[in-house]
């Protein structure tokens, strides 16, 4: 558990104080009023009491009854009719499950606009929930973080030990940060604004039933909201926004960050820059992805690799499978149908056939597979020894005879020794200087029968490793029957 910082908390909770009921609050029968009143006062104390609080005289000057003032604040925030009374619509809001971060102060950015001063953030899941398998939790968390990284120049790298920027855990009741959970329903989770100590940490109430679907509280939905706080956003008054404080299920596989959230997060970090070539980061696929027309396109594949006895060609949300020596029977499939964890837009891939494993790269992460079966959660590309300024791989190819993998990044490439498990010295080197006849940006690469095939735009260069020169050039689309 991190040490509680002196400031920068996203969660501001005060002690509950039960005052004498004011007749002006009454908007229910006497039988239900008392329970509504106590529930409402606890809710308002938790979510509508500003840190430090205004002076008592100021509170009285604004409203004869401070609770009426706070009820009106709640009604204004949620777009309700402003009555100052605990009417049915107001009580309906109060009874909804919600985030544990209060609604006071600025509704988009936290006071002082705290934000991270770096663009690579680490995260660690230190405690899991029994409601879901660890693999499901890992997937939901990764997808929730990815929802934000599509809009801003932030990348998230998972670590499995030590102190991360964003520590994630499932907790019960009083868990040591002074903001205890309240059991099933009520407060689902809370997060701390960027900063030292607890800054960025995100806690989920382990008393809830968490799920990847709708039979319980969807972890992706709640996690994506809480990570907005961990990045510096407050609550939004826009009911369509992810940062709206009450729970509303979002389908993880069809989710796109709403406009209000995009504006808020980009006000802190600016937009994510899109460079020529492949997208900087993958996009979550729509329900029915369209098939790229590579037969009439100047674009190349995103990645190419052998997998068993098949060649796989990746483009956007689609991949093609074909037997090496059989150019017929090639059909496209969605990436999610065979690799649900990858979702879309693979940057690079390669297979080490003698070990029976393959590697798939997206942004600063990679996945390991045996055949079409994922082997655990995503890992960081820095495991290979890349310098920190490298945030994505353009292409990768494994060379069987020297047992080395070449990684192409921009105009350069790195050489990784698969036997020693370390990056070779004196790299990176310039690609065009080292591979005679190869030109242009390398989008993908694969080795077959002693030749390296470099995919660059609409061209594929066949490079003879013995002659150390290109021996032919073909259309990239010819590989899938065009």
Swiss-Prot record:
EC number, as in UniProt = 3.4.24.-
- Per the record, the major location class is secreted
Q: For Ca(2+) 2, which residues are the binding ones?
A: 182-183, 185, 187, 205, 208
Signal peptide location in the record?
1-21
The listed location of motif Cysteine switch is 97-104
Q: Propeptide residue ranges?
A: 22-106
What keywords are annotated for this sequence in UniProt?
A: Autocatalytic cleavage, Calcium, Disulfide bond, Extracellular matrix, Hydrolase, Metal-binding, Metalloprotease, Protease, Repeat, Secreted, Signal, Zinc, Zymogen
What are the recorded Gene Ontology BP terms? Answer: amelogenesis; extracellular matrix disassembly; protein catabolic process; proteolysis
Cofactor(s) demanded:
Zn(2+); Ca(2+)
Q: Name the residues annotated as catalytic in the UniProt entry.
A: 226
> What modifications follow translation?
Autoactivates at least at the 106-Asn-|-Tyr-107 site.
Q: In which tissues is it expressed?
A: Expressed in the enamel organ.
| Disulfide-linked positions | 295-482
Q: Where are the Hemopexin repeats?
A: 292-342, 343-388, 390-438, 439-482
Q: Where in the cell is it found?
A: Secreted, Extracellular space, Extracellular matrix
Q: Name one GO molecular function term.
A: zinc ion binding
- Binding of Zn(2+) 1: at which residues? 99, 225, 229, 235
Q: Belongs to which family?
A: Belongs to the peptidase M10A family.
Q: What's its job?
A: Degrades amelogenin, the major protein component of the enamel matrix and two of the macromolecules characterizing the cartilage extracellular matrix: aggrecan and the cartilage oligomeric matrix protein (COMP). May play a central role in tooth enamel formation. Cleaves aggrecan at the '360-Asn-|-Phe-361' site.
User: What domain comment accompanies this record?
Assistant: The conserved cysteine present in the cysteine-switch motif binds the catalytic zinc ion, thus inhibiting the enzyme. The dissociation of the cysteine from the zinc ion upon the activation-peptide release activates the enzyme.
Q: What is this protein called?
A: Matrix metalloproteinase-20
The organism is Mus musculus (Mouse)
Query: Its encoding gene is what?
Result: Mmp20
């Amino acid at each position: 558990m991190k040490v509680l910082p002196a400031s920068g908390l996203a969660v501001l909770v005060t002690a509950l104080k039960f005052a004498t009921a004011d007749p002006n609050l009454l908007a229910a029968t006497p039988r239900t009023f008392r329970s509504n009143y106590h529930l409402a006062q606890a809710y308002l104390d938790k979510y509508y009491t500003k840190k430090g609080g205004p002076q008592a005289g100021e509170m009285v000057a604004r409203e004869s009854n401070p609770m009426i003032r706070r009820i009106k604040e709640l009604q204004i925030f949620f777009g309700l009719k402003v009555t100052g009374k605990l009417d049915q619509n107001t009580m309906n809001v109060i009874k909804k499950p919600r985030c544990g971060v209060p609604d006071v102060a600025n509704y988009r950015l936290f006071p002082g606009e705290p934000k991270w001063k770096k663009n690579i953030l680490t995260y660690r899941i230190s405690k899991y929930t029994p409601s879901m398998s660890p693999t499901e939790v890992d997937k939901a968390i990764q997808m929730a973080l990815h929802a934000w990284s599509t809009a801003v120049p932030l990348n998230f790298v998972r670590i499995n030990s030590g102190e991360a920027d964003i520590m994630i855990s499932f907790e019960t009741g009083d868990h040591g940060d002074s903001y205890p959970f309240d059991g099933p329903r009520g407060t689902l989770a809370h997060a701390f604004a960027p900063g030292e100590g607890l800054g960025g940490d995100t806690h989920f109430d382990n008393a809830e039933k968490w799920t990847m679907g709708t039979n319980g509280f969807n972890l992706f939905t709640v996690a994506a909201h809480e990570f907005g706080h961990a990045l510096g956003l407050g609550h939004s008054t826009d009911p369509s926004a992810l940062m709206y404080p009450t729970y509303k299920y979002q389908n993880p596989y069809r989710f796109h960050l709403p406009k209000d959230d995009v504006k808020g997060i980009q006000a802190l970090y600016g937009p994510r820059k899109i460079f020529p070539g492949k997208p900087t980061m993958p996009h979550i696929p729509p329900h029915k992805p369209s098939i790229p027309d590579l037969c009439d396109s100047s674009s190349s594949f995103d990645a190419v690799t052998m997998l068993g006895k098949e060649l796989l060609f990746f483009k956007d949300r689609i991949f093609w499978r074909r037997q090496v020596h059989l150019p017929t029977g090639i059909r496209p499939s969605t990436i999610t149908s065979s690799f649900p964890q990858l979702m879309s837009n693979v940057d690079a891939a390669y297979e080490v056939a003698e070990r029976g494993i393959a590697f798939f790269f997206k942004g600063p992460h990679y996945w390991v597979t045996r055949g079409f079966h994922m082997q655990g959660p995503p890992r960081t590309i820095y495991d290979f020894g890349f310098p920190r300024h490298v945030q994505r791989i353009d292409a990768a190819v494994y060379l069987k005879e020297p047992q080395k993998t070449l990684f192409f990044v921009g105009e350069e490439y790195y050489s990784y020794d698969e036997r020693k498990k370390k990056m070779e010295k004196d790299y990176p080197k310039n690609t065009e200087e080292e591979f005679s006849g190869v030109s242009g940006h390398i989008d993908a690469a694969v080795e077959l029968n002693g030749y390296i095939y470099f995919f660059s735009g609409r061209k594929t260069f066949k490079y003879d490793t013995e002659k150390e020169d290109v021996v032919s050039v073909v259309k990239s689309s010819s590989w899938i029957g065009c």
